[in-house]
């Protein structure tokens, strides 16, 4: 997910309980969506997901992350600045019952701040940080277990666009997808182990993969220029 964000794709997080394939109770995994106005409609909910105003929980309604950049910008928001500048980030972890763990702020795939502690009903755990952006990038928040190994909450990103430039945060991540698609094309060739899964028009399938590879190659080239 972070690799795709680093390539400039704006992807909303959403999730749900895969019952009966998953043994956890229904509602254990859910998506919070910010919906404008007092009336909730299906269209507003879908639009909220499409626009990235989401937080995914693996612990039902027992906890929530409230991410704000520059006090008002939440997940899905695009912040535009004309030149290198700082943004102020805050996240609040609220709970319905006492939980210990840690909250983290992630920018361009790297943890830039973390806070360990205990959140209690009416007494959320709060983390503040400042991040400088010289190039376009993104920020999100997540709640981990005390060891920092398991995700329980994750927000969609806030995007910071500098001088109207695209997000090209990592040349390596873009190259990763070029290599990945090259491997797929190799595996689906006649005689390849995955060829049997494409009994129809293989050339059409390959054309789609090549088109995607060309997009990533363009991102690689742009990333090298932006990050030089």
For every predicted segment, state its role.
Residues 2, 6-13, 17-228:
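C-terminal functional module detector
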């Amino acid at each position: 997910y972070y690799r795709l964000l680093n390539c400039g794709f704006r992807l909303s997080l959403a999730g749900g309980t895969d019952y009966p394939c998953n043994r956890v109770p229904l509602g254990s995994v859910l998506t919070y969506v910010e919906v404008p106005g007092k009336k909730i409609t299906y269209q507003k909910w879908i639009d909220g997901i499409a626009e990235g105003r989401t937080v995914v929980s693996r612990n039902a309604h027992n906890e929530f992350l409230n991410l704000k950049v520059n006090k008002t910008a939440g997940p899905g928001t695009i912040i535009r600045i004309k030149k290198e500048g700082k943004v102020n980030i805050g996240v609040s972890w609220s709970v319905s019952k006492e939980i210990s763990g840690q909250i983290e702020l992630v920018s361009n795939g790297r943890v830039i701040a973390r806070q360990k502690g205990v959140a209690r009903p009416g007494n959320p755990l709060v983390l503040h940080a400042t991040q400088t952006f010289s190039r376009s990038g993104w920020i999100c928040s997540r709640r981990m277990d005390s060891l920092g190994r398991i995700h329980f909450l994750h927000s969609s990103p806030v995007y910071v666009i500098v001088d109207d430039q695209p997000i090209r945060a990592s040349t390596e991540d873009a190259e990763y997808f070029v290599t990945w698609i090259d491997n797929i094309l190799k595996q689906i060739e006649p005689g390849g182990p995955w060829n049997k899964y494409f009994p129809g028009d293989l050339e059409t399938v390959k054309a789609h993969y090549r088109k995607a590879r060309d997009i990533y190659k363009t991102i690689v080239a742009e990333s090298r220029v932006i990050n030089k």
